[in-house]
Amino acid sequence: MQINKKEIKQNLKKWNEEKKSIKSFSFTGDIILDNVSYTYSKKTPFEFRALDNADLTISDKKITCVIGTTGSGKSTMIQLTNGLLISETGQTIVGDYKIPAGLKKIKEVKDLRREVGLVFQFPEYQLFQDTIEKDIAFGPIHLGADKEEVYKKIPELLDLVSLPREYAKRSPFELSGGQKRRTAIAGIIAMDGKTLVLDEPTGGLDPKGEEDFMNLFLRLNKNQGKRIIMVTHNMDQVLKVADEVIVMHEGKVISKGSPFEIFSNQELLSKIQIEPPKLYKLMYKLKEKGTDLLNKNIRTIDEFAKAFKEVRKGK
C-alpha cells in the first residue's frame, strides 16, 4: 500500500488543531477546578507552589468570594479561569470550555476571555487610550465585537458604573482614582461575558467608593445574572454580598460555604489567620457572655439589632 504523505500531514495538522481546542460542548454553567496545581519559577531557587492539587466548583449566577492569606493561591486560581495561566495537573472547566493541564495554546482564547472578564487589582493603571469611550471599547473590539454596536452601548455602560455620559469624550487621565476604576470595570462589562472575576476590586478606595462598587456588583448579579467571583481581604464586604465563600490555605481549598457558615467557624478563621467581619466579632463576644446569635444568618446591623431584641425577649 502506497503511503500518501500529503494526507498524513493534513491529518496531523488537523489533529494538532483539535488538540488545542478547549470546546467540550458539555455546558453545565459551573466553573470547575479539578485537581489543579501551579508552580511559579520552577527549577529555580525561587520556586513556589501556588496551587497544590486544588479542587473547586464555583456555581453559576452567584456571588462567590475567595478568601485566604497572602500566598494562599487566590490570585493564581482566578487566573486559571480565563486561561491567563494553565495548570500543571488536572483540568479547568469553565462552562463548555475544558482546559487540560499543560496545554501550550488555547485555540478559543478570545471566546473564553469574552465569557470570563478578569479585573486585576488597581485596573485603572491599565487605561491607555485618549478617551474614556475608546478605553471601554478596546477590550470587546479586540475580542471581535462589532465596533458600532460596542459604541452604541457606551452611554448605558457609563450609567451602570455611575459615570456621567458626557465623560465619554474625556481623557481617562483627568479622572479621580475611583472614576478610573469605574472606567476599567466598564470595559470588562462591555465584553458582556457571563462571569466577572475581580481581584481586590476596592483596594485603595474610600468607604463611599467601596460601598458604591459593592452595590454595582450586586446589581450586575441580581439584574443581569452575572456570576461574580471576588478575591478580597475585606471580610465586611464578603458578609455583605457573598452567596458562597471559598477559603484557601497553602494552595488548597480547605472550606466552602455560606458566609454565615464560614464566619461562625472561629476555629477555621483562627487557622487561616483571618479577622472576621465586625458584626461577627461582636457576636463572638456576646456568645462568651451567654447570648448566641451565630446561627441567625445576620448580614447587617439592622438584622443584628432585630435578632438581639428577639433573643433578649426570649430570656
Curated annotation (Swiss-Prot):
The keyword Signal does not apply. It is an enzyme of class 7 (translocase). SMART domains: AAA. It is found in: Cell membrane. The keyword Cell membrane applies. Gene3D superfamilies: P-loop containing nucleotide triphosphate hydrolases. Forms a stable energy-coupling factor (ECF) transporter complex composed of 2 membrane-embedded substrate-binding proteins (S component), 2 ATP-binding proteins (A component) and 2 transmembrane proteins (T component). Its EC number is 7.-.-.-. It comes from the Bacteria. InterPro entries: AAA+_ATPase, ABC_transporter-like_ATP-bd, ABC_transpr_CbiO/EcfA_su, ECF_ABC_transporter_ATP-bd, EcfA2, P-loop_NTPase. This is Energy-coupling factor transporter ATP-binding protein EcfA2. The gene is ecfA2. ATP-binding (A) component of a common energy-coupling factor (ECF) ABC-transporter complex. Unlike classic ABC transporters this ECF transporter provides the energy necessary to transport a number of different substrates.
